[in-house]
Design a protein with these regions (language model features):
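Structured beta-strand/loop patches that form or line metal/cofactor-binding pockets in enzymes
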Residues: 40-69
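NAD(P)-binding Rossmann-fold cofactor-contacting core
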Residues: 252-286
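Glycine-rich Rossmann-fold phosphate-binding loop(s) that bind the pyrophosphate
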Residues: 236
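Hydrophobic Val/Ile/Leu positions in short beta-strands of Rossmann-like dinucleotide-binding domains
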Residues: 231-233
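Glycine/serine-rich phosphate-binding loop and adjoining beta1-alpha1 elements at the start
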Residues: 94, 113-227
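N-terminal Rossmann-fold NAD(P) dinucleotide-binding loop
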Residues: 240-241
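Single conserved hydrophobic/aromatic residue that forms the stacking wall/gate
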Residues: 287-299
Length: 299
């Protein structure tokens, strides 16, 4: 494998897509030794076929805000690879979303899904729409407008989206509701749905729990016990909540969590009722951390 040659070719085809190019290079460097032991891979141009997405959909999403003004965002779906199953990957709503980021995420999702040994391909989608500061009605209207285009390209045997940053059970519910209306079908087209219409009970905490199980096994492999360790968690959503909860159960002490507005530090530990209370405030859009807080006082 000639990594420099591959990257030169990709840079010419995808100029300016730094996130995607960096992700590809990191993967190539990590598999180079093993790949070079299999000349049949080179003969089949396996890498060249893996690094390019199967197809990309880009579309405009016009929607009406609470003031009656029409807003227009961009929507994307990158169907990266379905060699072993339907495309599978989340939908992200965040102002930073662009095609390079989604290609990078879809590329890595292909490998993550393959490692589960389940028949799932890789994909990713989203929009530069940010739910932050938007009303429930605005978020609903945007999700419905987004699905007016995306519904043609997803389905239980084609492409199965899920949530990601900015997309939780509420947003998935809005999108799935519009999908059902357009297709007149109730199928397994989305994961991350609410319990009331076929979702999984452990979905909210699954990612955070899984991350801590992985960390715990890595520490054990090094002969280190997680009990008594001090932990800092970057994030303030479902993944962070699951990670904090499981870290505490395993005997570690989480002293800080962070969000887009700042962070909370509590040397006595952030867990249990404290984090549940903060997540409740966040869900109600009442919490705003404007300055770093050294000792959080939560009663």
């Amino acid at each position: 494998m000639d990594i420099n040659q591959i990257m030169t070719s990709l840079e010419a085809k995808h100029p300016g897509e730094s996130e995607y190019l960096q992700a590809v290079k990191e993967v190539l460097l990590s598999i180079e030794d093993i790949y070079n032991q299999h000349p049949e891979f080179e003969k089949a141009s396996l890498i060249e076929r893996l690094v390019e997405p199967d197809r990309i959909f880009t579309f405009k999403v016009p929607w009406v805000d609470d003031k009656g003004k029409v807003q227009v965002n961009l929507g994307y779906r990158v169907q990266f690879n379905n060699a072993i199953g339907p495309y599978k990957g989340g939908i992200r709503f965040h102002a930073s979303v662009n095609l390079s980021i989604l290609k990078f995420l879809g590329f890595e999702q292909t490998f993550k899904n393959a490692l589960t040994t389940l028949p799932m391909g890789g994909g990713k989608g989203g929009s530069d729409f940010s739910p932050r500061g938007k009303s429930d009605a605005e978020i609903m209207r945007f999700c419905q407008a987004f699905m007016l285009e995306l519904w043609r390209h997803v389905g239980p045997d084609m492409d199965v989206p899920a949530g990601d940053i900015g997309v939780g059970g509420r947003e998935v519910g809005y999108m799935f509701g519009m999908y059902k209306k357009l297709t007149r079908e109730f199928t397994g087209t989305f994961t991350g749905k609410g319990l009331e219409f076929g979702g999984s009970l452990i979905r909210p905490e699954a990612t955070g729990f899984g991350g801590l199980y992985f960390v715990n096994q890595m520490l054990k492999a090094k002969g280190i016990d997680i009990k008594g360790k001090t932990v800092a968690v970057s994030g303030f959503g479902n993944v962070a909540w699951g990670a904090v909860t499981k870290a505490t159960e395993l005997g570690a002490k989480v002293v800080t969590i962070s969000g887009p507005d700042g962070y909370i530090y509590d040397p006595d530990g952030v867990s249990g009722d404290k984090i549940d209370y903060m997540l409740e405030l966040r869900a109600l859009s009442l919490i705003h951390i404007s300055e770093p807080t050294r000792h959080a006082q939560i009663s």
